């Protein structure tokens, strides 16, 4: 839980700016995004965090099983880091941006699952989707009877 709440600690200001930005990322913004996992790791250490699982999950939450992630490009991240990555991707999909609409939760879950299958399939994606649900609390759905619930 601590890792999930602090995984983007090094880019809080940038996230707020990007929320409103309509233009493509600048080179500096792209660099800041790619370095935020390590900077977050270092910032948490400076703040006194010593739990290695927490620190590694923050550092590795953009790594992928295919080795195409960042910042290290490794494929040996922990299950905790992988779960954070999946949750981060899901949250990004369902969040509105100035340049695009939010993806509906059921579609975001489907995309997350299919993307994960293409990367070799990790059971954690199914676990996350099962926990979050395809219609999270607060969602409106139309029942077979036509009633909206």
Regions found by a protein language model. Name each.
Residues 1-149:
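Histidine- and acidic-residue-rich, metal-dependent catalytic cores
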